Structures are given as C-alpha cells and as structure tokens.
Amino acid sequence: MLTILAVSDSIGETANQVAVAAASQFTEKVDVKRIPYVKSLEDVEDVMNIANECESVIIVSTIITVNVREHLTQKAMEKNISVMNVLGPIINVASTILNTHPTYNPGAMRQTDEVYFKRIEAMEFAMQYDDSKDYRGLKNADVVLIGLSRTSKTPLCMYLANKGVKAINIPLMPEVGVPDEIYEIDRKKVFGLTINPLRLIEIRKRRLDKFHRITSDIEYAGDARVLEELDFADKIMRKIGCKTIDVTERAIEDTALIILEKIGYNNK
C-alpha cells in the first residue's frame, strides 16, 4: 500500500490537505500520515525511520527552514524516496517577481491560523449573546450595539465577528429598559443605531407581511409605537453618551466600517 507522509515544520495542515487531495484521485487505498513540527535534523531522521517502515512511500513537504528541508531531500534521495516540496516552487517564483528574499518563517502560517480562530471565537460570541438577556458578555465585548428591533443589529454583529471583533447587541424596548451594566462599560465601544421612522415602519410592515396570518396594522409597525420607541432609544443613547449611527440608507458594510475606524481596528 502507498503511504503519503505529510511533513511540516508547523502544524502540517497544508501538507496534509495536499496529500489528501492527491490520495482522493485514486480508487486504491492510499494512507496519509501527518508528521508535524519537523524542525531539526534529528526530526528528519525520525521521518526517515517512519518512511522505512512503509511498503511504498511519497513525502509531501511544506518545510520552510532551508537546512532542514535540504536535509530531508538528501536523506530521501539516498533511500530513493520521492519528495514533493509544495511551497518551494511558489516561494521561488514569488521571490523573483518581488525581487526580495523570503523570510523563511515557519510560524507565518500559524499567524493566519490565529486570525481564523479569533474570527470563529468572535462569531460564537455574537451568536451566544444575540438579543440575549444574558449581559455577562458586555465586559468582554469589543463593541456593544444598541438599537430598536429591525435596525440590523444582528447582521452587523455577525459582519463584525467575521473581522474578529466580539460584538454584542442589546435591543431597546420601552417596557424592558437597558441593563445597568451598560453604564459601567467604556462608552467608546457602545454604538447606537438610529433610523428614520418612516423607513422603520416600512421595514417592520414588510417583516410582518411575511407572516400571512399577522396583519401589518398591529402595534409593532404602528406609527405611534415606532415614534415612542425612537424617543425612548434617543433618550437612552443620550444618557449613555455613545456614538450614534444613522442606518436608514446605509449598508451594513458601511456601518461596520465606521465602527471599525472608531475602535481603531485598522491600527491593531
């Protein structure tokens, strides 16, 4: 049986994906074995010991460190084992075009992984505290959105989460009020979403029309109710002293850009 060794001086995800993609092209059984953190000449010897135990073997490598990569290639050639250096050709071509030398930093990919996991964490945070009565997340949030129903709080939270920003949204309703905790956090991370009353009425009526048995004349979309809510929201935002953003004719991306600039996202 053929074995493909996915060898890397980092976690080995890239090498493993390449090996799995190659193996999937054959009906015959191909075993893929990931070997991460090959960072020294001694580690290379361990790889070769594993290779020697295989009936038939190919090595797919994403090792960046030059001396380790060359040592692996040399040892494999001595055993007549094929080595595919996945990143080498791409790095060489890019180096020529950019007219600069690569850093050969094995941890560079890990930095990208950290950004990815930060994004996932922010998304989980946004979902956990979406329109929630659990306000424990306020102190851990990067951004706190407050606004009436149908002012795009949830999609805005998710958009920010995709940037790795932990956002929580607090719905404003006259009957409920706001949690005391919101007055205890830094007001610079609180953003009040405002909207034109006619536009809000239109959005709410359209929302209700999606539910065939619910008339759009109910209080939720009524003029008096909307004006009452807007007045309540305005008083709360003034009391907090937070930045307000009119979302009437503004795309979610544009609103997010304003927030990201205010919290210094591009400077992090």
From Swiss-Prot:
Keywords for this protein: Kinase, Nucleotide-binding, Serine/threonine-protein kinase, Transferase
Enzyme class: transferase
Pfam families associated with the record: Kinase-PPPase
Binding site for ADP: 147-154
Source species, domain of life: Bacteria
UniProt keyword Transferase present: yes
Documented EC number(s): 2.7.11.32, 2.7.4.27
Role noted for this protein: Bifunctional serine/threonine kinase and phosphorylase involved in the regulation of the pyruvate, phosphate dikinase (PPDK) by catalyzing its phosphorylation/dephosphorylation.
Protein name: Putative pyruvate, phosphate dikinase regulatory protein
Species per Swiss-Prot/TrEMBL record: Clostridium beijerinckii (strain ATCC 51743 / NCIMB 8052)
